[in-house]
Curated annotation (Swiss-Prot):
Cystine connections: none
Protein's name in the database: Maturase K
Species: Syzygium australe
Highest taxon above the source species: Eukaryota
Protein task: Usually encoded in the trnK tRNA gene intron. Probably assists in splicing its own and other chloroplast group II introns.
Keywords attached to this entry: Chloroplast, mRNA processing, Plastid, RNA-binding, tRNA processing
Compartments where found: Plastid, Chloroplast
Taxonomic path: Eukaryota, Viridiplantae, Streptophyta, Embryophyta, Tracheophyta
Designated gene of the protein: matK
């Protein structure tokens, strides 16, 4: 963000009014290129030319406002390499610059909010692992849970209207609306709906989707605060809105009866918790199924009448936490009852006390993980390691380093597992697959290669956690081993490995 501030040097209070002129500045596309925003789509293939980028954008916007936006002269294709490519490339040029521009007000507002609330180490909140300590702390005291699939068929006009509450630049919004209608078929699908979580989606459309989800969660947060004894304060930094409460009151008057406020305060729910991940959300509560059905009704009404998205009530299931497992973010999470029997003796009488305590457990689902390893040609569908085809010019050290990197990344991500047995099996598959790959390259047997590599090869597959803990506790080996076998959550994990993403 310091780089953004250095480039633009605009007053924060007026920054959202000057977005459209930035679209024709050279440094916008330099930022998009230098920060790696989809560089493989545009700049790596077509080449980046600072002197001609703004000229290209001006011509594209001019032709987009005309009847035939893709009529280019022969001189254009000769003078500029951009015009020698297809329509997708032209739309990518504008979307790249527009994505950088519209993110500026959001980013600066978030930074100022974090500074005002004096929240240190806010980057830790972005870690995927930061969700699980929250679940460990809260879910062991809850009873019911709903795993909700957030509707993703969103009309493009609703996306523009949602962004209008954040960006007050009419020219930028008009250009965005025209751009979406013009290039929608070439960028997404022939239908006017977004297909989410696809690697081919531009950054701009992911930004529009996230702003739409922010709109939904803002309303959901308002409803939650109105119906709860406990007011939520920690989420305020993520849901700053302009004219937010005015819109909420209008929403309540139109789609609910006059007793809406009374209904909210009648059903007090102090233990409603919400978690969102990968286009899904989790609702958990300590109260009865009646209150869970209340929130189910709220969500269905919210999506159908406010966002015009068809949402079937049957897609929201209400389950008991003690009988249900949640599969998300590469883990299988559940709440289990752990019984402990204590024998007590008082004078001549002795009796047994059976204590049942709830514990939140997270394990590695081995079957989906083996399926991912099978698709990546590390093993077959039964989990038996196989040799992986490699390039002829790959050295042995490169092959070993590649397998070690994959093994350590998986171990690092799954360090929070309650049980390590599945993780040990994954290590075994990767280790033996590495040996078979080397043996196949040198046309030797696996046994011969094991003897050649020796015990040092097995030690190389020690995870980063084991090495670090052994350095911290050099004289207490049992302590480091016990800590490693426990759950460790890291706050530096911001992305999911492709082998872990089963969705």
């Amino acid at each position: 963000m310091e780089e953004f501030q250095g480039y633009f040097e605009l007053d924060r209070x007026r920054q959202h009014d000057f977005l459209y002129p930035l679209l024709f500045r050279e440094y916008i596309y330099a930022l998009a290129h230098d920060h790696g925003l989809n560089r493989s789509i545009l700049f790596k293939n077509a080449g980046y030319d600072k002197k001609s980028s703004s000229i290209v954008v001006k011509r594209l916007i001019t032709r987009m406002y005309q009847q035939n936006p893709l009529i280019f002269s022969a001189n254009d294709s000769i003078q500029n390499p951009f015009f020698g490519h297809n329509k997708n490339l032209y739309s990518q040029i504008i979307s790249e610059g527009f994505a950088v521009i519209v993110e500026i007000p959001f980013s600066l507002r978030l930074v100022s909010s974090l500074e005002r609330k004096e929240i240190a180490k806010s980057h830790n909140l972005r870690s995927i692992h930061s969700i699980f300590p929250f679940l460990e702390d809260k879910f062991s005291h809850l009873d019911y849970v709903s795993d909700v699939l957030i509707p993703y068929h969103i009309h493009l006009e609703i996306l523009v209207q949602t962004l209008r509450y954040w960006v007050k630049d009419a020219s930028s919004l008009h250009l965005l609306r025209f751009f979406l209608h013009e290039y929608w078929n070439s960028l997404i699908t022939p239908k006017k709906h977004i297909i989410l979580f696809s690697k081919g989606n531009p950054r701009l459309f992911l930004f529009l989707y996230n702003s739409h989800i922010c709109e939904y969660e803002s309303i959901f947060l308002f409803l939650r605060n109105q119906s709860s004894h406990l007011r939520s304060t920690s989420s305020g930094i993520f849901f700053e809105r302009i004219y937010f409460y005015v819109k909420i009151e209008h929403f309540a008057k139109v789609f609910f009866d006059n007793d809406f406020q009374c209904i909210l305060w009648f059903f007090k729910d102090p233990f409603m918790h919400y978690v969102r991940y990968q286009g899904k959300s989790i609702l958990a509560s300590k109260d009865t199924p009646l209150l869970m059905n209340k929130w189910k009704y709220y969500l269905v009404t919210l999506w159908q009448y406010h966002f015009y998205a068809w949402f079937q009530p049957g897609r929201i299931d209400i389950n008991q936490l003690c009988k249900y497992s949640l599969d998300f973010l590469g883990y299988r999470s559940s709440v289990r009852l752990n019984s402990s029997v204590v024998r007590s003796q008082m004078l001549e009488n002795s009796f047994l006390i059976n204590n049942a305590m709830k514990k939140f457990e997270t394990i590695v689902p081995i079957i989906p993980l083996i399926g991912s390893l099978s698709k990546a040609n590390f093993c077959n569908t039964l989990g038996h390691p196989i040799s992986k085809p490699t390039r002829a010019d790959s050295s042995d050290s490169d092959i070993i380093d590649r397998f070690l990197r994959i093994c350590r990344n998986l171990s690092h991500y799954h360090s929070g597992s309650s049980k390590k047995k599945s993780l040990y099996r994954v290590k075994y598959i990767l280790r033996l697959s590495c040996v078979k790959t080397l043996a196949r390259k040198h046309k030797r047997t696996v046994r011969t290669f094991f003897k050649r590599l020796g015990s040092e090869f097995l030690e190389x597959f020690l995870t980063e956690e084991e090495v670090v803990l052994s350095l911290i506790f050099p004289r207490t080996y049992s302590t480091s081993r016990r800590l490693y076998r426990g759950q460790i959550w890291y706050l530096d994990i911001t992305s999911i490995n492709d082998l872990v993403n089963y969705e």
